[in-house]
Design a protein with these regions (language model features):
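A short acidic, Gly/Pro-enriched loop at the edge of an enzyme's catalytic core
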Residues: 1-10
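Alpha/beta-hydrolase-fold catalytic nucleophile elbow
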Residues: 13, 44-47
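Short "lid" loop at the C-terminus of a central beta-strand within the Rossmann-like core
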Residues: 16-17, 39, 48-53
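A short glycine-rich, Lys/Arg-flanked "PGG" loop and its adjoining helix->strand segment in the class I
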Residues: 17, 24-39
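Short amphipathic alpha-helical segments embedded in low-complexity Lys/Glu-rich regions
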Residues: 25-29, 48-51, 60, 133-140
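SAM-dependent methyltransferase
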Residues: 46, 50-123, 128-130
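Core SAM-dependent methyltransferase catalytic element
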Residues: 123, 157-177
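Charged, often glycine-rich, active-site loop that binds/positions anionic groups
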Residues: 138-159
Length: 177
């Protein structure tokens, strides 16, 4: 990297959960972002909503989605906490995630976004937007139904998501700081 603070945007897509293994990893990520983003720049990303996954796994050790009896994703609880306290960081809360298109299971960690926002503020970042993929889907559907021509803009080749695909997708949120 040529100079610090050279980037107007830093992107971290589908990987923040790895930094929730421990505090040092998370602080290293945030320090790296802070060191390399220009004043007024944006830090954008996507991650699972850890609280939603925690709630999903409250009564089951494993949840999965299928299409035609084939498992397309599964999330397995590998932690012992019984409550998800948003005021605490909750580092190291492992889940095992399998996504068919990736083809293997990976260890990930629950993201406590409330804590993430709080620690980002300490580094001078303000949350601009935190939005669930479900809301993007609703907005997209509404735009397709209510466009000016009264015709759906939907690409005829676009496949409709199954309920199980939606369930996995809707666990994701985007953020902008």
């Amino acid at each position: 990297i040529p100079n610090k603070n050279d980037f107007s945007m830093v992107s971290c897509q589908f990987c923040v959960h790895y930094y929730f293994e421990n505090e040092m990893k998370l602080r290293t990520l945030i320090q790296n972002v802070s060191d390399n983003i220009t004043m007024g720049g944006y830090f954008i990303g996507t991650c699972f909503n850890g609280k939603n996954i925690f709630n999903m796994l409250k009564s089951n050790k494993l949840v999965e989605g299928k299409i035609d009896d084939k498992v397309i994703w599964k999330i397995e609880k590998d932690y012992k906490i019984r409550t998800f306290n948003e005021e605490k960081p909750n580092f190291g809360q492992k889940i095992k995630v399998y996504i068919d298109s990736i083809g293997e299971t990976h260890t990930e960690y629950l993201v406590n976004f409330t804590y993430f926002e709080k620690i980002m503020k300490k580094y001078g970042f303000e949350l601009v937007e935190y939005k669930g993929f479900e809301q993007y889907y609703v907005d997209f559907e509404k735009d397709n139904i209510n466009n000016k021509n009264g015709n759906k803009n939907k690409n005829k080749n676009m496949k409709e998501l199954s309920q199980d695909e939606k369930e996995l997708s809707f666990l994701n949120y985007s953020f902008v700081f």
